[in-house]
From Swiss-Prot:
Protein name per the record: 1-(5-phosphoribosyl)-5-[(5-phosphoribosylamino)methylideneamino] imidazole-4-carboxamide isomerase
Family recorded in the similarity comment: Belongs to the HisA/HisF family.
Protein species of origin: Paracidovorax citrulli (strain AAC00-1) (Acidovorax citrulli)
Pathway annotation from the record: Amino-acid biosynthesis; L-histidine biosynthesis; L-histidine from 5-phospho-alpha-D-ribose 1-diphosphate: step 4/9
Disulphide bonds in the chain: none
GO cellular component: cytoplasm
Keyword Cytoplasm on entry: yes
GO biological process per UniProt: L-histidine biosynthetic process; L-tryptophan biosynthetic process
Length: 248
C-alpha cells in the first residue's frame, strides 16, 4: 500500500484547502522543496503534487515550486502532478523535466479526445483524477457537478490506456472524516487498473481499512491534511501499512 503525501501548491506555498475552497486555505510551509524532502525522509515512495492555482486557472502556474521539488527529490522517487494540465505540450514539458506521472482531471471529462491523445503519446505516464460526490463526477476545481457516473467514465478511460485512477470523494476532502472505503472499493472492483484513494483520510484506522482492501485493486492513498495537522504520523503509518501487507 502506497501512502502518498500530498503537497498542494498555492502562490508557491504548501497549503491545504477545505473541500476545494481556495478561500479556505491553511498554509503549512513556504518551502515546497523542503516539504518534499521531509516526506521522502519519512519513508514516502511517491509524492502527489497539486498546482491549485493551475487547477482554477486552467494552465500551469506554480512552475518554480514544481521545478524545485523535482530538483530536490525527482531522482529519489516517482512524482505525480495534477492541476491545470490541458494540453500535450504541458505534459511533454513536465515529463521532460523529471515528472513521472501527470494527472488529468477536468480535461479528461470535458475533452476526452485530449486524454486519448495523451495516452497514445505518453503511455505509462497518464493518471486520471476523478473527483466525485455521491457517485457523480465533478469538474472545474469541484465547482461543477456533472451527470457522469464515476464507474462508467473510469472504465472508458481504462480502455484508452490510463495508468491508474486517483479517486477523490469531494464531500470528505480536507474534512478528516474518513476515506469513503465503500465507494473506492466499488470503483476498484470494476477496473483492472489500480485505484488510488483520496479525500478524508483521518488516521491509522483508515490505513488499516485500506490495507484490507488492497487486493481489490486499491493501490494507495493520498495523505493530505491528516499528516499536516498531526492526526497521522506518516512514517508510522507507512510502516504499519508495510507490516499489514507483508512489504519489506
Amino acid at each position: 500500500m502506497l501512502l502518498i503525501p500530498a503537497i498542494d501548491l498555492k502562490d508557491g506555498h504548501c497549503v491545504r484547502l477545505k473541500q476545494g475552497d481556495m478561500d479556505q486555505s491553511t498554509t503549512f510551509g513556504e518551502d515546497p522543496a523542503a516539504m518534499a524532502r521531509k516526506w521522502v525522509d519519512a519513508g514516502a515512495r511517491r509524492l502527489h503534487l497539486v498546482d491549485l492555482n493551475g487547477a482554477f486557472a486552467g494552465a500551469p502556474k506554480n512552475h518554480a515550486a514544481i521545478k524545485a521539488i523535482l530538483k530536490e527529490v525527482g531522482d529519489d522517487l516517482p512524482v505525480q502532478l495534477g492541476g491545470g494540465i490541458r494540453d500535450l505540450d504541458t505534459i511533454e514539458k513536465y515529463i521532460d523535466g523529471g515528472l513521472r506521472y501527470v494527472i488529468i482531471g477536468t480535461a479528461a471529462v470535458k475533452n476526452p479526445g485530449f486524454l486519448k491523445d495523451a495516452c497514445s503519446a505518453f503511455g505509462g505516464h497518464i493518471i486520471v483524477g476523478l473527483d466525485a460526490k455521491d457517485g457523480k463526477v465533478a469538474t472545474d476545481g469541484w465547482s461543477k457537478l456533472t451527470g457522469h457516473e464515476v464507474v462508467d467514465l473510469a472504465k472508458r478511460f481504462e480502455d484508452w490506456g490510463v495508468e491508474s485512477i486517483v479517486y477523490t470523494d469531494i464531500g470528505r476532502d480536507g474534512m478528516l472524516s474518513g476515506i469513503n472505503i465503500e465507494a473506492t472499493v466499488k470503483l476498484a472492483q470494476a477496473l483492472t487498473i489500480p485505484v488510488i484513494a483520496s479525500g478524508g483520510l483521518a488516521g491509522m484506522a483508515d490505513i488499516e481499512q485500506l490495507c484490507a482492501v488492497e487486493s481489490e485493486g486499491v493501490e494507495g492513498v493520498i495523505c493530505g491534511r491528516a499528516i499536516y495537522s498531526g492526526d497521522l504520523d506518516f512514517a508510522a503509518a507507512q510502516a504499519r501499512a508495510d507490516e499489514l501487507n507483508g512489504a519489506a
